From Swiss-Prot:
Cystine crosslinks: none
Cofactor(s) in the UniProt record: Zn(2+)
Family matches, as Pfam families: Anticodon_3, tRNA-synt_1g, tRNA_bind
Keyword Magnesium in record: no
Source organism, top-level taxon: Bacteria
Protein's name according to its UniProt entry: Methionine--tRNA ligase
Motif 'HIGH' region, residue numbers: 15-25
UniProt-annotated binding residues for ATP: 335
Cofactor note: Binds 1 zinc ion per subunit.
Length: 675
C-alpha cells in the first residue's frame, strides 16, 4: 500500500531584526532545511516558513541611533537576512515579517479571544520612567551601582560582578541607559495573560510523549515552581502593535512574535490561493505543525505559545524540535577572536554546502551544543565530501567519457553490492526522519568507504591498460558511477548545491524511489570538478576578516584602561579575605534568571551553594562540573530571590560572554587556602 502523503507546516524561530545572521543562527535553519528537504523527497507536502521578529524596544532605540525610522531599518535587515538564507540554500516557501497586516490582525484576534474567555487580567505595576525620553524603562535599560558589591555600571536586574539579583529600584544612583537621566517611579496599568489557568492542559501536553525528554523534564521543573501570570503589554513609546481599545498600550514583542508563524503562513495562503489557513491552524487541524527552535526560547514556545493557542481556539504544535548552541573552537563565538562569523562573511569565502555538511554530521535529536572546530571542519569536508564521495565519480567518469562515449554499461557488475547500498535506504531514511542526521551521515560515509574499496580492488586504471578487457572496464566504472549516484541521493537533503551539479553530470534527477533501478545504458555528461577542497588558509582569512568587520572604530582599550585599579588597601584588609580552592560538583541554570548559574561547591569536607552571574559565558553549565575554581569562603551569606548564596567564585573579564572563571594549577585540592 502506498504511503499517504503528509501535510506538514515547518517553522524556524524568527531572527530578530536588529542584527545580522551569524553561524550560530545557521545551525537551526540548516537543521530544519535538511529535514524539510528529506520530507519533500519522500513525497510529503511541506510548507516551510519564517519571518523577521521586527518589534520591541531594542529595534526602536537602534533605529533612533541610526537616524532612521524603524520601518526602514527592519526592511533593510529583512533583505539582508533573506539574502543570507538564500546563500545557504534554505528552501523557505515564504519569508515574512511580524510587522505586517496579517500579524496585526491575528494578534488582535487572539488577544480578543483570550480577553473574551477571561484569560486577560489587568493590574497596576510600578516601573522606572525616563523623564527625558518620556518612556518606561525595561530592567535592562537601567544601569547603576550594584547595591550588594557596589560595582558600577550594572544592569537593573542583575550584577554581572557578584551575581546578585535585585529590582531596578534597588540600584544605587540609577541612570537610564537610553538618555543618562535619573529615572523616576511611575505607575502604569498592564495587561497579564493568565498562564496558570492552563497548567493542567500544559502538563498533559508535556506528558503526551511527543516532546523531547529534555524539554519535558525542563517543563516539569517550571510546573513544580509554579506558573506565573505573564505581562503582555508595554507602554508607549514602543515599536509594535497597539492593543485594541487601549491607547498607549502595545503588545509585548513575545506576544506577537510567535503569532508571526501564523502571519507568515497567512501571507503565503493569500499569495498562492490554493492553501487553506484553517487546515493548518484550526482547532481540529489534522495536519502536522513543527517548530524548530533553540533551547534558549523553550520557555516561550512550550508554555506561553501553546496556552495562547488553546485559549484562543487554535491548534497546538505537533512538536517542538529543540537544538543546542554553537561554539567555535570549543568556546563561545568571539568578536575579538574573529569566531563571531556572519553568514554573509562566510559566503564570501566558502561553499555553503561545507557548513551544511559539517552541522549535519554533528546533529542529533538531542539538545546538545555543537562545536564548530575549524580545523576539524576543513578535514572532515575534504575527507568525506571530496576524497570519499566526489572522488568516486572522478575516478570512474574519465574512463566512461573517453572509452565509452559517456555511455554506462547495460548490466550491473555486482548486483549484490548494489542491493547492499539500496537496502540502507530504510535506516538512513529513519535517521533523517528522526532528526538524527549525524547517524545518517555516518552510515552514508561507511557506504562510501565500501564503494571506494570496490574501486580500489577492481583497479580500473590497471584494467584500462590491458587488452581485451574493455567490457570489464566498462562494467567496473559503471558500477562506481551507480554507487556514487546512490550516495548522492542519500546526501541530497544536506548538499543541495553539489546535488544540482551532480544531477547535471549524471543527466538525471536524484530521487529516493529511483535508486532501486540502477542507471543502465544511460548517457552521462563530461565530468567537471564537482566540489573544491577547503583550504585552511581560506578559513583563516575568513576569521581575520571577521575580526576586522567586528572591530570597533574607537581607540584601543585594555583591561586597565577599561577597569582602572581601585584604591590601595592595607595588608590587614586583604588578609580578612579567605579564598579557598573549590571543586564544582554541580552547575545548573537558575529558573527565572538569564544571568545566574547555581553552583554546588565542595571545599574538602564542606559543601556550599553559590549563585554566580556567569551564565552568559557558560551556556552549558554541565561543562563546569568537575572543574576546580577559587572562591571567597568567608563572605557573609546573602539571601537572594532564588535562595541563599554562601560565598563568591572568582572570575575575570569585562562581563557578558567575556567572563573567565579562575582555576588553580594542577595539584591543588578542595579546601586549600589561597595565599
Amino acid at each position: 500500500m502506498a504511503q499517504v502523503a503528509k501535510k506538514i507546516l515547518v517553522t524556524c524561530a524568527l531572527p530578530y531584526a536588529n542584527g545580522s545572521i551569524h553561524l550560530g543562527h545557521m545551525l537551526e535553519h540548516i537543521q530544519a532545511d535538511i529535514w524539510v528537504r528529506f520530507q519533500r523527497m519522500r513525497g510529503n507536502q511541506v510548507h516551510f516558513i519564517c519571518a523577521d521578529d521586527a518589534h520591541g524596544t531594542p529595534i526602536m532605540l537602534k533605529a533612533q541611533q541610526m537616524g532612521i525610522e524603524p520601518e526602514q531599518m527592519i526592511a533593510e535587515m529583512s533583505q539582508e537576512h533573506q539574502q543570507d538564507f538564500a546563500g545557504f540554500a534554505i528552501s523557505y516557501d515564504n519569508y515574512h515579517s511580524t510587522h505586517s497586516d496579517e500579524n496585526r490582525e491575528l494578534s488582535s484576534l487572539i488577544y480578543g479571544r483570550l480577553k473574551a474567555n477571561g484569560y486577560i487580567k489587568n493590574r497596576t505595576i510600578s516601573q522606572l520612567y525616563d523623564p527625558e525620553k518620556g518612556m518606561f524603562l525595561p530592567d535592562r535599560f537601567v544601569k547603576g551601582t550594584c547595591p550588594k558589591c557596589k560595582a558600577p555600571e550594572q544592569y537593573g536586574d542583575n550584577c554581572e560582578v557578584c551575581g546578585a539579583t535585585y529590582s531596578p529600584t534597588e540600584l544605587i544612583d540609577p541612570k537610564s541607559a537610553v538618555s543618562g537621566a535619573t529615572p523616576v517611579m511611575r505607575e502604569s496599568e498592564h495587561f497579564f495573560f493568565d498562564l496558570p489557568a492552563f497548567s493542567d492542559m500544559l502538563q498533559a501536553w508535556t506528558r503526551s510523549g511527543a516532546l523531547q525528554e529534555q524539554v519535558a523534564n525542563k517543563m516539569q521543573e517550571w510546573f513544580d515552581s509554579g506558573l506565573q501570570q505573564w505581562d503582555i503589554t508595554r507602554d508607549a513609546p514602543y515599536f509594535g502593535f497597539e492593543v485594541p481599545d487601549a491607547p498607549g498600550k502595545y503588545f509585548y514583542v513575545w506576544l506577537d512574535a510567535p503569532i508571526g508563524y501564523m502571519g507568515a503562513f497567512k501571507n503565503l495562503c493569500d499569495k498562492r490561493g490554493d492553501l487553506d489557513f484553517d487546515e493548518f491552524w484550526g482547532k481540529d487541524a489534522k495536519t502536522d505543525l513543527y517548530h524548530f527552535i533553540g533551547k534558549d526560547i523553550v520557555y516561550f514556545h512550550s508554555l506561553f505559545w501553546p496556552a495562547m493557542l488553546e485559549g484562543s481556539n487554535f491548534r497546538k504544535p505537533t512538536n517542538l524540535f529543540v537544538h543546542g548552541y554553537v561554539t567555535v573552537n570549543g568556546a563561545k563565538m568571539s568578536k575579538s577572536r574573529g569566531t563571531f562569523i556572519k553568514a554573509g562573511t562566510y559566503l564570501k569565502y566558502l561553499d555553503a554546502d561545507c557548513l551544511r555538511y559539517y552541522y549535519a554530521a554533528k546533529l542529533s535529536s538531542r539538545i546538545d551544543d555543537i562545536d564548530l572546530n575549524l580545523e576539524d571542519f576543513v578535514q572532515r569536508v575534504n575527507v568525506d565530501i571530496v576524497n570519499k564521495v566526489v572522488n568516486l565519480a572522478s575516478r570512474n567518469a574519465g574512463f566512461i567519457n573517453k572509452r565509452f562515449a559517456g555511455q554506462l554499461a547495460d548490466q550491473l557488475a555486482d548486483p549484490v553490492l548494489y542491493k547492499t547500498f539500496t537496502d540502507a535506504a530504510t535506516s538512513i531514511a529513519d535517521a533523517y526522519n528522526n532528526r538524527e542526521s549525524g547517524k545518517a551521515i555516518r552510515e552514508i560515509m561507511a557506504l562510501a568507504d565500501v564503494a571506494n574499496r570496490y574501486v580500489d580492488e577492481q583497479a580500473p586504471w590497471v584494467v584500462a591498460k590491458q587488452e581485451g578487457r574493455d567490457a570489464d572496464l566498462h562494467a567496473i566504472c559503471s558500477m562506481g558511477i551507480n554507487l556514487f549516484r546512490v550516495l548522492m541521493t542519500y546526501l541530497k537533503p544536506v548538499l543541495p548545491s553539489l546535488t544540482e551539479r551532480t544531477e547535471a553530470f549524471l543527466n538525471t534527477e536524484l530521487t529516493w524511489d529511483s535508486i532501486e533501478q540502477p542507471l543502465l545504458g544511460h548517457s552521462i555528461t563530461a565530468f567537471k570538478a564537482l566540489f573544491n577542497r577547503i583550504d585552511l588558509d581560506k578559513v583563516n582569512e575568513m576569521v581575520a576578516s571577521s575580526k576586522e568587520d567586528m572591530a570597533p572604530a574607537t581607540r584601543v582599550t585594555g583591561p586597565l584602561a577599561d577597569d582602572p585599579i581601585q584604591e590601595t588597601i592595607s595588608f590587614d584588609d586583604f588578609a580578612k579575605v579567605d579564598m579557598r580552592i573549590a571543586l564544582i560538583q554541580q552547575a545548573e541554570f537558575v529558573e527565572g534568571s538569564d544571568k545566574l548559574l547555581k553552583l554546588t561547591l565542595e571545599l574538602g569536607g564542606e559543601t556550599r551553594q553559590i549563585f554566580s552571574g556567569i551564565r552568559s559565558a557558560y551556556p552549558d553549565p554541565k561543562a563546569l562540573e568537575g572543574r576546580m575554581t577559587v572562591m571567597v569562603a568567608n563572605l557573609a551569606p546573602r539571601k537572594m530571590r532564588f535562595g541563599v548564596s554562601e560565598g563568591m567564585v572568582i572570575a575575570a573579564g569585562p562581563g557578558g560572554s567575556d567572563i573567565f572563571l579562575l582555576s588553580p594549577d594542577s595539584g591543588a585540592q578542595p579546601g586549600m587556602q589561597v595565599k
